[in-house]
Amino acid sequence: MKEIEKLKEEYPLLNKLIATEEVFWVNPNMEKYETAIKDSPLSEENVKDAEERLKRFASYIAKVFPETKETKGIIESPLLKIPSMKQALEKNYEQPILGELLLKCDSHLPISGSIKARGGIYEVLKHAEQLALQHGMLTEEDNYAILDSDTCREFFATYSIAVGSTGNLGLSIGIMSAKLGFNVTVHMSADAKQWKKDLLRSKGVNVIEYEADYSKAVEEGRRQADADPSCYFVDDENSHDLFLGYAVAASRLQKQLEELKIVVDEEHPLFVYLPCGVGGGPGGVAFGLKLLYKDNVHCFFAEPTHSPCMLIGLMTGLHDKIAVQDIGIDNVTDADGLAVGRPSGFVGKTMEPFLSGNYTVSDEELYRLLKELADTENIYLEPSALAGMIGPVKVCKEDAYLQKQQLMEKVQKGTHIVWGTGGSMVPEDVMNGYYKTGEALTILEK
């Protein structure tokens, strides 16, 4: 315990985090892009390689997931202006949001309805491609739609895939692996929602449930895979492939911004707010965006007050050597996708020089924001997906970051993108429950 007391002295913000109060933290270790990229374990080439692989698989995806036909097998989500929500935020928080506000609707990504459809599906496809190439089932010049055959499914059925998840990553890995023919096991933590487990089982996925939290589910998944040479483990805590699958989102977003005639340059900064669990999804997206927009994009991670694992890891520099439970935080939150007690050391160390900051948000606030977005824009997200929504308010209100980066004059001409990470697959009765909770909390507040 002495070490914790020492940490609290060194990082006074820890006291607020321990009290589960909402905090806003500016990253003192952020560097200029050109310096940061020199020490990065990943590069633009890695992201381009991932992008090319997804293009090779597009004909297969379009064939087996009819909902992707229109986009020719490219798994992408809309970018929407949300002016009514912007007005509501300004009114409710008595804070003008300088610049335009948009929502990136990964909540409505085809196949698995969350940001995890990016990294999760990509990693499974990469593994399938490697196996098929090794065994002469495929060449890179082939039309990958040939993988949709009994022969290929029977081949993949001799291999298995395992993953530990609080929910959404499990959905992506499970749905994609089962479609290819793999035997797939998803190790689900205690906070995983029942409907997610039911949906996976309906797709022929083996779901193993744990009483413990996310870290335990990952540990068990890793153990199972270690004992079986034909089993591939998707390691959410350390996976470069997941990270790169998420990073591909950046070039897609760039095209969408161009279509909307939104400029990003030194005079027109871009601010992006990303809900963060273990870190792979937001880390990958932020990394991809930094490669494209360099010092003109400012990325913030958003975490629940009861699971601020990445913030604690980054602030203390201990990364995955510290868990929220070590300092007396319970890691219990309704934002199930973000209910992670120990961050990814790989993501924390990779993103440390690129990340602008991090903030926390309470479950109550997430529910109120959920209701507000439904009322103003008729868009329904799951609670964890609303963590980014309060970001523009926090950045404009606590202007320490804007001052430090000399953005006070520029923010007005800038753009804020809130990353809506999941929600379209939530069953109607569950979503109605979320909405009612938001309604009750809004009445209470007033």
From Swiss-Prot:
The keyword Lyase applies. It catalyses: D-serine = pyruvate + NH4(+). Its EC number is 4.3.1.18. It is an enzyme of class 4 (lyase). InterPro entries: D_Ser_am_lyase (IPR011780), Ser/Thr_Dehydratase (IPR050147), Ser/Thr_deHydtase_PyrdxlP-BS (IPR000634), TrpB-like_PALP (IPR001926), TrpB-like_PALP_sf (IPR036052). GO terms for molecular function: D-serine ammonia-lyase activity; hydro-lyase activity; pyridoxal phosphate binding. Pfam families: PALP. It comes from the Bacteria. One of its GO terms (biological process) is isoleucine biosynthetic process. Keywords: Lyase, Pyridoxal phosphate. Its cofactor is pyridoxal 5'-phosphate. The modification N6-(pyridoxal phosphate)lysine is found at K116. PROSITE patterns: DEHYDRATASE_SER_THR. Signal peptide: none annotated. CDD domains: D-Ser-dehyd. Belongs to the serine/threonine dehydratase family. DsdA subfamily. This is Probable D-serine dehydratase. The gene is dsdA.
